[in-house]
Swiss-Prot record:
Keywords: Cytoplasm, FAD, Flavoprotein, Methyltransferase, NAD, NADP, Transferase, tRNA processing
PANTHER family for this protein: GLUCOSE INHIBITED DIVISION PROTEIN A (PTHR11806), METHYLENETETRAHYDROFOLATE--TRNA-(URACIL-5-)-METHYLTRANSFERASE TRMFO (PTHR11806:SF2)
Name of the protein this chain belongs to: Methylenetetrahydrofolate--tRNA-(uracil-5-)-methyltransferase TrmFO
InterPro entries (UniProt xref): FAD/NAD-bd_sf, MnmG-rel, MnmG_N, TrmFO
Organism: Beijerinckia indica subsp. indica (strain ATCC 9039 / DSM 1715 / NCIMB 8712)
Function of the protein: Catalyzes the folate-dependent formation of 5-methyl-uridine at position 54 (M-5-U54) in all tRNAs.
């Protein structure tokens, strides 16, 4: 019998990792600090407790990236998707679950596994004699363990709050109004002097935009989050409240830029978007971290010239979320470069969302099991949802864009993380498509490619350890 692998954290990611390891015939010790020590957001001692929404979002694999991820995890015998399907509630096209039933299902499955030992109690540091560890403690990692992780990774490599700017699909930006240009045409590392997409506003548009920011309905911080405002990362609406011209001297300053469509007309303000992933399919709105409610964000940001038809891969936010600078401190197998005994899984790696966290837990569990058994593991192709998500958090970000370093930010799975299609998007008759019709077909083709490629990966011996026939 192989020696056990320790998994710290009994949330969705930790439970999934433990399940995958046990399915490979390897003993697991799963550590969960609750109920000995709880958090302000948890209310029970169950594993995989859902502390926010009870929705796993869209379940349609033909038109949503998260639906593709659901499909892939079902194919790979995910405990979390089993629990969700067995506790499903009516929610239209979404996968919503009964919280208590879901958590009880996961807890019962973990306790019933003869290869998983559930240990209740806080882990405050990593013992030297543990040779394989997965840390899956999530956004509410205890202060003591967070301090230990911080010491292992370096003070600058563990963030305690997300400052999320909205991310827009590049192909939804109207380039008849927007243009590419870096401020003063500056060429930075990896750039060409035209690294930003610029959207111009006249005075009337700017004033209406500022008013919309101030009057828009905001999301309040949860009591346990506190208010983490600091000058380097203020929500854009807080900046707007400091004075009507503040944004024109901050993220919306128009200096050093010339409207390529109207060179003689000086914009009153400019919104800049910066490439957000290596594929160039996603662009983030620079300096636009916000606590506006999502519907308010969509309506207001679509008043910006060039973004009238914008589709958002992610909307802005600011909330507590402990996460690593994964591309810097972890390797491609999510092992800590400074101490390869340690792997990380879930939200602490920089993925965002219940299912994404569980998906990374699934992969990390398989990676750890293969390593314990001396087997090879090849990650799923980047054309799959699991592969695209793993690639983004390990290698898909933009490390530098101008003179300064680029911060790594968490991301949900979305179609912008998938490599572009190589074939032309045309109707069965060969007709060129536009607008929503083109977008729908593109999603179907990406979904079909993901399904084919995942199936091919699943049949290869390097996709993970062979599950036990029965437990």
């Amino acid at each position: 019998m192989p020696s056990p692998i320790h998994v710290i954290g009994g949330g969705l990611s930790g439970a999934e990792a433990a399940w995958q390891i046990a399915k490979a015939g390897i003993p697991v010790i799963l550590h969960e600090m609750r109920p000995d020590r709880s958090t302000p957001a948890h209310h029970s001692a169950d594993l995989a407790e859902l502390v926010c929404s009870n929705s796993f979002r869209a379940d349609d694999a033909e038109s949503s990236a998260i639906g593709i991820l659901h499909r892939e995890m079902r194919r790979l015998d995910s405990l979390i998707l089993q629990a969700a399907d067995c506790n499903r509630l009516p929610a239209g096209g979404a996968l919503a679950v009964d919280r208590q039933g879901f958590a009880a299902f996961v807890t019962a499955a973990i306790k019933a596994s003869p290869l998983i030992t559930l240990v209740r109690g806080e882990v405050t540091e990593i013992p030297a004699d543990w040779d394989q560890i997965i840390i899956a403690t999530g956004p509410l990692t205890s202060e003591t363990l967070a301090a230990h992780i911080k010491a292992l990774t370096g003070e600058d490599d563990l963030a305690f709050f997300d400052a999320i700017a909205p991310v827009v699909y590049r192909d939804s930006i109207d380039m008849t109004k927007a243009w590419f240009q870096s401020r003063y045409d500056k060429v930075g590392p990896g750039g060409n002097g035209a690294d930003y997409i610029n959207c111009p506003l006249d005075k009337e548009q700017y004033q209406a935009f500022v008013e919309g920011l101030i009057q828009g309905e905001k999301i309040s911080f949860k009591e346990w989050e506190g208010t983490p405002y600091f000058n380097g990362c203020l929500p854009i609406e807080i900046m707007a409240e400091r004075g009507p011209e503040t944004l024109r001297h901050g993220p919306m300053k128009p200096v050093g830029l010339t409207n390529a469509h109207a060179p003689t007309v000086k914009p009153y303000a400019i919104v800049q978007l910066r490439q957000d992933n290596a594929l160039g399919t996603l662009y983030n709105m620079v300096g636009f971290q916000t606590k506006l409610k999502h519907a308010e964000q969509i309506a207001l940001f679509r008043t910006i010239p060039g973004l009238e038809q914008a589709r958002f891969a992610r909307l802005g936010g600011l909330h507590r979320n402990i996460f690593l600078n994964t591309p810097k401190v972890l390797d491609m197998r999510l092992r800590l470069k400074a101490d390869p005994r340690l792997r990380f899984a879930g939200q602490i790696t920089g993925c965002e969302g219940y299912v994404e966290s569980a998906g990374i837990g699934l992969l990390v569990g398989r990676m750890a099991a293969c390593e314990r058994l001396g087997e090879s593991f090849v990650p799923p192709p980047t054309t799959t949802a699991l592969g695209a998500l793993l690639n983004h958090i390990t290698a898909g970000h933009i490390e530098t864009i101008d003179a300064g370093p680029r911060s790594f930010q968490p991301m949900n799975v979305n179609f912008g993380l998938f490599p572009p299609l190589t074939e032309k998007i045309v109707s069965p008759e060969g007709k060129r498509l536009r607008g929503p019709e083109k977008d729908q077909l593109k999603k179907r083709l990406l979904s079909q490619r993901a399904e084919r490629d995942l199936e091919a990966w699943c049949t290869a011996p390097t996709c993970g350890p062979t599950p036990l026939a029965a437990e």
